[in-house]
């Protein structure tokens, strides 16, 4: 190795061989019932007198389904084959993945609970595995998760959310970003086995992985080696 090359390696580190080769498609889910509700005047996150509407594990709206079909057209054209398709176990991500990647050749697909959204609101509380098994393809491998797989919280969980009325515990930043660090490692572990990995997830998750704000059904195409060593942290 030349002195110049050695200096670069010592300065920035040498990417893992799998990281440098594996493409990573990051996708945010389509528009949901909670997205619609939060867009109303005075209903947004942190609004005075905020009250959670108790929309549990929200589904895609007709607009969200249309966005997922548009995603499908793009995937069929630009990425007609994906080695591994991962999705958060929340309904909006699973539905986006099933619509958005229909007809795309996927060697393997599975749910990735590390990619669930940070538990802000009722919409981020998951559905029992037995319910998901009735609604989505068995190819996801739901049997690998416990019945109640989502963040539970307890009376010791500190409240970090803006003043308001909530119907579920909020996932504190320490817990969430520790989970995001494990997700980064899990994605890197996939790199040596697959050429293209797709992950369908959520705003908070994708922001932690990239530092960017993703719109509904927006996606990015990058390398696993582009992932940060530690998650990007957004202010509460």
Predicted regions and their residues:
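Bacterial N-terminal signal peptides that target proteins for export
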Residues: 1-6
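Acidic, low-complexity terminal tails and accessory targeting/binding regions
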Residues: 7-15, 19-27, 33-37, 42, ...
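Active-site-proximal alpha-helix that buttresses catalytic centers in soluble enzyme cores
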Residues: 19-107, 111-112, 133
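Short glycine/proline- and acidic residue-enriched helix-loop micro-motifs
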Residues: 50-58, 140-172
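Conserved AMP-binding/adenylate-forming core of the ANL superfamily
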Residues: 60-65, 170-177
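A short, structured active-site edge motif that brings together acidic residues
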Residues: 84, 89, 106-125, 146-150
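A short, acidic, amphipathic alpha-helical segment used as a generic capping/interface helix at domain edges
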Residues: 176-192
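ATP-dependent carboxylate-activation loops
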Residues: 200
């Amino acid at each position: 190795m030349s002195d110049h090359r050695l200096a670069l390696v010592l300065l920035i580190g040498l990417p893992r061989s799998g990281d440098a080769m594996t493409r990573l498609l990051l996708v945010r889910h389509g528009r949901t019932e909670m997205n619609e509700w939060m867009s109303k005047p005075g209903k947004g996150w942190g609004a005075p007198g905020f009250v959670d509407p108790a929309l549990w594990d929200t589904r895609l709206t007709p607009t969200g389904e249309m966005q997922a079909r548009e995603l499908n057209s793009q995937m069929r054209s630009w990425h007609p084959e994906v080695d591994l398709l991962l999705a958060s176990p929340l309904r909006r991500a699973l539905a986006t993945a099933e619509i958005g990647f229909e007809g795309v050749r996927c060697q393997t697909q599975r749910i990735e609970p590390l990619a669930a959204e940070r538990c802000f609101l009722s919409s981020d509380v998951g559905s029992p595995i037995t319910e998901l098994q009735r609604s989505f393809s068995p190819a996801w491998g739901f049997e690998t998760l416990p019945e109640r797989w989502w963040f539970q919280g307890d009376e010791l969980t500190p409240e970090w959310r803006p003043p308001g009325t909530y119907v579920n515990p909020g996932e504190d930043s320490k817990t969430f970003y520790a989970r995001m660090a494990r997700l980064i490692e899990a994605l890197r572990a996939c790199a040596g086995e697959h050429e293209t990995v797709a992950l369908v997830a959520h705003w908070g998750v994708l922001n932690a992985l990239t530092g960017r704000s993703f719109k509904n059904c927006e996606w990015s195409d990058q390398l696993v080696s582009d992932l940060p060593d530690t998650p990007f942290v957004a202010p509460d």
